[in-house]
Amino acid sequence: MSLSMRDPVIPGTSMAYHPFLPHRAPDFAMSAVLGHQPPFFPALTLPPNGAAALSLPGALAKPIMDQLVGAAETGIPFSSLGPQAHLRPLKTMEPEEDVEDDPKVHLEAKELWDQFHKRGTEMVITKSGRRMFPPFKVRCSGLDKKAKYILLMDIIAADDCRYKFHNSRWMVAGKADPEMPKRMYIHPDSPATGEQWMSKVVTFHKLKLTNNISDKHGFTLAFPSDHATWQGNYSFGTQTILNSMHKYQPRFHIVRANDILKLPYSTFRTYLFPETEFIAVTAYQNDKITQLKIDNNPFAKGFRDTGNGRREKRKQLTLQSMRVFDERHKKETGTSDESSSEQAAFNCFAQASSPAVSTVGTSNLKDLCPSEAESDAEAESKEEHGPEACDTAKISTTTAEEPGRDKGSPATRAQLFPAEPSRARDTARLDKASPDSRHSPATISSSTRVPGADEHRSPGREGPVSAKVDEARALPAKDAFAPLSVQTDATAHLTQGPLPGLGFAPGLAGQQFFNGHPLFLHPGQFAMGGAFSSMAAGMGPLLATVSGASTGVSGLDSTAMASAAAAQGLSGASAATLPFHLQQHVLASQGLAMSPFGSLFPYPYTYMAAAAAASSAAASSSVHRHPFLNLNSMRPRLRYSPYSIPVPVPDSSSLLATALPSMASAAGPLDGKSAVLAASPASVAVDSGSELNSRSSTLSSGSVSLSPKLCSEKEAATSELQSIQRLVSGLEAKPDRSCSGSP
């Protein structure tokens, strides 16, 4: 029974083993079938006798019926064809032979390519890979909107020559080197429909050029021997390997295919643009090409003089400051003595927790500039000190509120005196003060400019006492380059509360040490008149004792107003009897600056020592315990910033207590009053101007808030100071602040 039932069954007609033969073979091209297969070719792994049947380039266009019939004729069992023989009909794929397109390609930025081509385009190649500029960008049209395309780019040798750049032109230097491994770059958006490709500019900006022959990026496909474009293995990746000093031609390819693995069996449409030809170099040979790249490439930071990073900005700031510094030096040595309109925008700010935050400006610019070797980590550490000081106090900064005011130039000097031999000798001695000026604290730096002639301020803003601000900047031209720098081992930090006081006579305000870096001191502690002995104690053996009978601040004034030979012999009373504006001009001519608010030493070394000796009885022991700050901890303050950072303003009563007795006994009424003004907790703002040419060192980017009440006895001299008042820029009067610091 069972045998009779099985006899009618034809062998091979069972559903499990019967091969599926479609009714209309042209509906199922091999390309359509492969498009829905995994990204490999398991169906093409045929035995040797049947390999030719399905491995031909045209196999993808053959109907599957023909392939199956051919396989049967060669004796291949259908089971060896694998799952290819059992595919169900696929209705979603359109036969490729029905797609008609006429692609057209247009090169983008053709004018820029032409400019480079006229001069001989060069492309830099590096071991890690360098992108092309101009980037290779094209716009496609004429593609079938529904069909999928793969867009590729490769770079081939334009000829078989090696080149060299000689006499400003490229010339043949011999036969080409052996060809590098072939490499093709596939656009990362591939495959995509024609509609997608035509809707945008196709850019190959991520392609990199390298000379690293061991580059392992990418993958390899084997192209059949009868492929129209290539034969053999061809690698695909993001980097193309080139030979230096060889000429190359980029090519653009369009392939209608929906799978990258079908590239070896697809038709390539290739497009050449002669203007994209270039020579591969390891460094640019033609300066014109370099300039073209700088002018047109927004990312050519390596060539451009100005960069966006901190180091680039700092470097350019340094170079500009040095140029201005040199120009000023030339003017000072010549007939003109003005440096009015050219000031470096180098604000090394140094605000501290003090009653009078004061004096930041352009000192010796070469030493103030942070070195190029400083790391960015150090630059970041410089910024960390800012927020600590920001929260504790409010600084009145009318300098930022009055941008119209010219802060640019110092007052006109009455005359120039030649440098005395003793001054030159002192300068030589001071040059030895800082063997390591690079690490000396260079933050509080007053103006070292030579006075110009066009400085002005709005009249009536300040009392006549503020005219001494001029004296703070009246430094001789020949002395503007030799600052004294002092190096100590004290470790007091800027934001660790009130620091030990270091008082200065008012006549010693507004200046700096003259040898490299200015001294980093507590700014508010410079305002104590007559407390100069603390500097003598703090500097130790650095200051030599100078013989003389000068007493107190007025004695210091007299030393400045006399000639160098007889300066030490004048009494304080004789100096105090001179009118204020005469004192100013005489002091300016001698190179000693006077100011109602305190800062650093004036230039003449003998004056400093004399003042230190004269005021030795005025300072308490706590004033000079730690007069200097730690060099390394305050180094981050050397950084330029266009913003002013608020700092704490502590109570100044203790500082006043040490300074006022000596002021009352030793100083004249004028100096005593100005010392009280400086001791008041008037905030002197650091210049907040961010212009590179801001002339911020006139008042060392800070001015004192003066009170008309404190200047009442000077109202008689107002008419004599009208011309001087127009030469001084400062903050508006703040009576409440000035009165709070007065006893």
Swiss-Prot record:
**What are the Phosphoserine sites (modified residues) in this protein?**
S371, S434, S440, S458, S707, S738, S740, S742
Q: Which residues bind DNA?
A: 107-220, 241-305
Any one GO MF annotation of this record: DNA-binding transcription factor activity, RNA polymerase II-specific
Annotated localization: Nucleus
UniProt cross-references to InterPro entries, sorted A to Z = p53-like_TF_DNA-bd_sf, T-box_DNA-bd, T-box_sf, TBX2/3_TAD, TBX2_3_RD, TF_T-box, TF_T-box_CS
Among the entry's GO cellular component annotations, what is one? cilium
- Residue ranges with Basic and acidic residues bias: 379-388, 422-439
GO annotation (BP), single? embryonic hindlimb morphogenesis
Compositional bias of kind Polar residues: 440-449
Region Disordered: start and end of each range? 371-467
Q: Which domain of life is it from?
A: Eukaryota
Does the record's keyword annotation contain Chloroplast? no
Q: Which key words are in the record?
A: Developmental protein, DNA-binding, Nucleus, Phosphoprotein, Repressor, Transcription, Transcription regulation
Keyword tRNA processing appears in the UniProt entry: no
The record's function comment reads: Transcriptional repressor involved in developmental processes. Binds to the palindromic T site 5'-TTCACACCTAGGTGTGAA-3' DNA sequence, or a half-site, which are present in the regulatory region of several genes. Probably plays a role in limb pattern formation. Required for mammary placode induction, involved in maintenance of the mammary buds during development and branching morphogenesis in embryonic and adult glands; partially redundant with TBX2.
What does the annotation say about its assembly with partners? Interacts with PML.
Protein name (record)? T-box transcription factor TBX3
Encoding gene per record: Tbx3
